[in-house]
């Protein structure tokens, strides 16, 4: 660095120092600036405090405004309907009592006045929190709003009707109109509105619907009540179907239109019928914990036709009531076949011939008897006698055939002695000779089974009928307090492995009597019809094993059903014993001997049997040649 540069830098430094020293503030100005800074800081703190206080006071003073702003963001046009006080609206007639809530405008409670639970308490199909009905509204401003979150206003209220109104604005609203039919279990619901184009899009054609219910336990046996609890549904103009009642969980998606959907238990049901149809149906059910206060949780979601045209409406019918077959059938009177509700299918009567027997024979007969007798023990006895009388002509032929087999037993034993041995050749000869004897005498080895075979359709039909008919519910007879449930004469609380699971923790007396009478019937009839053949000896234990199985199976079933089976076995034994006095065995034996001298045309069954025997004999000989 040269001398000139150094001198220049020194001069610049002196100039800057001199300028700063000449322009420095005096002590009075410094003090004034300090005081001004302190005051400014104080004023800033006061301003912030006042702002915070003002904000707090504003928040305390105007919470509704803030909530309204937040509500509008979520509910849009229906934001105002999210505020309100919930109110209960009661509707009632002589059959049922309902409670509706202004929040959601839906039914919250259903009481059946004429019925009690198994332990004598009022019977509710559902109460608060056990059922939900919701219409998800897809609004004009692209929001999805649930009616369950909105408050309706009850208008036009009477003891049996009310209109729940959801106001959109002063000129637009959505109505849910409820009308309880007089002395009936049905409730009409109509969805309508005014100026709906201000709420829904102009191209709207379908409205969403959601419905759910927890099925309450009403009967003593949770297991058997749950067995008949399920979601039923009817296709539009077609048949009735259901979800599985045995699966722990089941669900279906149905694209076909449905006419109605039902959440049913053993004796009662909640049904939603659409005047038009349901589409996009999703049904689901899940079994509750065994032995709890609930049976299944049922849900449905669907859509139904609804648009924004003036005067548009959608009609529905709720049914909340007992599954009385004749009453449900009466709902279809005067309707065209394609319009029938077919609610009687909610009463399970079996399939094909068994449903036919119950529908056209058992139910009309029991309905007739109820006009003259109030005791169901007597009615079941008369039904049993009627069935036995109906099949008695055919049963007599069966007893006659059994008598023939019994008279031919000594001759069959002679054939067995003539062809002893257990080799295939001896067995074929023995069987052929026995068949020839039966054919010559005019006896049929299978005819003795006819009485039991004739009873099977009625026995199975009754198995379908008694557990599901509400007519015997809480009807007592002798020691049985309720013929629709088991009649425990002895019970225990300890859980015994396998026994408690399959038999139960009680002893049903009618079930025990049924088993004893069945064993007596088997023992008596088999002793009378035993021909001494080896096949009979091998199969003689099967009926006893079956009876023991029935003892376990029916112990928790309806005592009325066990009572019927008990009567049926006793009457059958009496009929069988009576046939011994009615049938003259000496004349019958003479007729059998006379038949042997007459040429007889082979029956088709006997011809097929002999042909099968010839084929077996031919195969046996071919096998021997190969050896």
Swiss-Prot record:
It is found in: Cell inner membrane. It holds the Pfam family YidC_periplas. GO terms for molecular function: membrane insertase activity. Keywords: Cell inner membrane, Cell membrane, Chaperone, Membrane, Protein transport, Transmembrane, Transmembrane helix, Transport. GO terms for biological process: protein insertion into membrane; protein transport. It is a multi-pass membrane protein. Its main location: membrane. Signal peptide: none annotated. GO terms for cellular component: plasma membrane. PANTHER family: CYTOCHROME C OXIDASE ASSEMBLY PROTEIN COX18, MITOCHONDRIAL, OXA1. Interacts with the Sec translocase complex via SecD. Specifically interacts with transmembrane segments of nascent integral membrane proteins during membrane integration. Belongs to the OXA1/ALB3/YidC family. Type 1 subfamily. Required for the insertion and/or proper folding and/or complex formation of integral membrane proteins into the membrane. Involved in integration of membrane proteins that insert both dependently and independently of the Sec translocase complex, as well as at least some lipoproteins. Aids folding of multispanning membrane proteins. HAMAP family: YidC_type1. This is Membrane protein insertase YidC. The lineage of its organism: Bacteria, Pseudomonadati, Bacteroidota, Bacteroidia, Bacteroidales. The gene is yidC.
